[in-house]
Amino acid sequence: MSRATPFSAVINGLTPFFASRQVICGSGRVGIGQSGDEAGFQLSQRADYIEVEVGLETTLKRGIINTRDEPHADADKYRRLHVIIGDANLAEMSTYLKVGTTALVLDLIEAGVHLTDLQLARPVTAVHHISHDPTLRATVALADGRELTGLALQRIYLDRVDKFMSAEGNDDPRVADLLEKWAMVLDLLERDPMECAHLLDWPAKLRLLEGFRNREGLNWSAPRLHLVDLQYSDVRLDKGLYNRLVARGSMERLVSEQAVLDAVDTPPTDTRAYFRGECLRKFGADIAAASWDSVIFDLGGDSLVRIPTLEPLRGSKAHVGKLLESVETAKELVDELTN
């Protein structure tokens, strides 16, 4: 994100958002507390491991906002926003809204929209409190004394993003789709979280667990429930419970399986990933290394040649497509780029 944005604005704007977005993108967890010894089900796998509001660490004293700043881009222009509070998701709607709504909120913050009125009185406690209540009725205290649910906080963010995009005249269909799905999911969650069991991870997992508990006559302290919890996320097609739900049409997908397979080897065309991917495809034998911020060529000389890719939105097909089509060898490409 832009380094010109004050980091205090990032903290103020994102802390309540991250604390509340787990109602949408939590992946569900059996057990309460870091050790999981207390019986119960909660929204998020990571919530109980968040211990401070802001911090650098990722394996202890984890923060809602992480300060690790390695942008893998032009450090004078860009700051890295290292998000460690989010769960890993399998449900496509959870992932779509997790990433998409965060991007929209960042647009607000970078534009200077003030969100200080949403500051939480006790942010870390709020993260835990929201996660521990799958009924979504738990309220958390704001610094100004108001008490709001996680759903209510998400609705405020949705409303402000919607108004901002309208004021800016933003007619991007991707933004419109995100806003529509964000609102739809919040409506369903407010009516009955189980109405999202075909869309989001934590309701899908909870539905499976409740069915298993009822069939086997188990309470939430039963060790077998932890096994079901883990098996939900098993990525093996024949073992993972999520994959079984997909196979029988019980989870709504947003992309086709073919689109997923295509994305394994076909980079997006509108970022530097296009340049990196096409270089690997055409000149893989001549590339010593490739990363976010450079492609390093080995042309057989005394030294390697590093081509920096410090601008995330340069190196797109529009920017370098014709150049890549016009050259036959890696040396020709490097000569064109360096001369």
Swiss-Prot record:
Domain of life: Bacteria
A single MF term (Gene Ontology): hydrolase activity, acting on carbon-nitrogen (but not peptide) bonds, in linear amides
InterPro entries in the record: Pup_deamidase, Pup_ligase/deamidase
GO biological process: modification-dependent protein catabolic process; proteasomal protein catabolic process; protein pupylation
Transmembrane segments: none
Family: Belongs to the Pup ligase/Pup deamidase family. Pup deamidase subfamily.
Annotated protein name in UniProt: Pup deamidase homolog
Record organism: Rhodococcus erythropolis (Arthrobacter picolinophilus)
